Amino acid sequence: MSPQTETKASVGFKAGVKEYKLTYYTPEYETKDTDILAAFRVTPQPGVPPEEAGAAVAAESSTGTWTTVWTDGLTSLDRYKGRCYHIEPVLGEKDQYICYVAYPLDLFEEGSVTNMFTSIVGNVFGFKALRALRLEDLRIPPAYIKTFQGPPHGIQVERDKLNKYGRPLLGCTIKPKLGLSAKNYGRAVYECLRGGLDFTKDDENVNSQPFMRWRDRFLFCAEAIYKAQAETGEIKGHYLNATAGTCEEMIKRAVFARELGVPIVMHDYLTGGFTANTTLAHYCRDNGLLLHIHRAMHAVIDRQKNHGMHFRVLAKALRLSGGDHIHAGTVVGKLEGEREITLGFVDLLRDDFVEKDRSRGIYFTQDWVSLPGVIPVASGGIHVWHMPALTEIFGDDSVLQFGGGTLGHPWGNAPGAVANRVALEACVQARNEGRDLAAEGNTIIREACKWSPELAAACEVWKEIKFEFPAMD
């Protein structure tokens, strides 16, 4: 540290560098109901005390900079500064600490996830005093939550729009994700919806490419939806991806979807950005469209255990920004997640009030007040044999999305959809009869095969499929 030097022209101002912990480490601080609270996993550089590292995070993500400045005297730092108020070691990890930081609410623009993240994680992750930094959780106070619209509609309104109750919803991502013409794409949509699915879906990178422009896709998918609805008597939907290179183009696509009368559109909220996502969510609420959210790019941010951001933070941010569905892992299949941790952020998406529970990765009690809930979407390498586990784990307020598990059926797309619908109905009936899906799942599926040759064929194809890869990190 360089020495502090008092200038002749000042009284009380000392130029130079001082330790962050002298100002920003305040273990005596009592948090306020209006504070935004953050739990950071901090890995300091060798020789940096955890108190200094935690204080540095609080400083660099709020009012601090690397040196004392004249203009500190023109405001009240005690009112606006972030505070590291508690530090605890991470069990089983060397030189890792959970540092809790409290931010005054006045630091953040109302109704802006963009500003919230710019402040809390925008700059501090490149700080030299830290080897690694991960934002594990945020507590969003009700006073700040009430400045957001949140999901366009929420779980109950979606069920009322679809007139579907008492079971999970079924979906399918159209494959191959790229390369189909708009007409062939629409054909696949029709076959899946006609077979019994509630939704089909554009993949995250289906936007408006030379082989299939967005307007053509929207038209053929709308035709497929209306034809399937007429033949089944059920309300159907296809997640029309409105993600685009500009907000203006995105809204233009959403407007066209509304004019076609379809029930739902889609957005890639991380690659598209929170400003674009909130803009689209507001449009969807005002115009009666449901909004499906894909989390493309999330693993770039959340996969490393000691650096980045946990998905529960991204999930909370999405609930603030707005979305009626979001992909949330499966616990089974090719994109597995730890069961308790996954269910922790699933509850944060759906429930009005979630208690602190460190065993489930929930660092803070979260009260969502009246903000609508978000339906979690389970997708990625799942098939009919997973249906009992998925029904038990995710419950009714979920979307179970089978891409290859529908389109990979040996008899075609529609039989694949039939197989999934029969498997789901069998699991829901068994659950309602009091049977244990975890213990009797395979038996329940085999019994249903007697009444559905489509399900029997699917069970035969996928009976040996597992996604088991040795962990290398």
UniProtKB/Swiss-Prot annotation:
Molecular functions per Gene Ontology:
magnesium ion binding; monooxygenase activity; ribulose-bisphosphate carboxylase activity
Q: Does the keyword Membrane apply?
A: no
Cofactor annotation: Mg(2+)
| Entry's EC annotation | 4.1.1.39
Q: Cellular location of this protein? A: Plastid, Chloroplast
List the HAMAP family. Answer: RuBisCO_L_type1
Write down what this protein is called: Ribulose bisphosphate carboxylase large chain
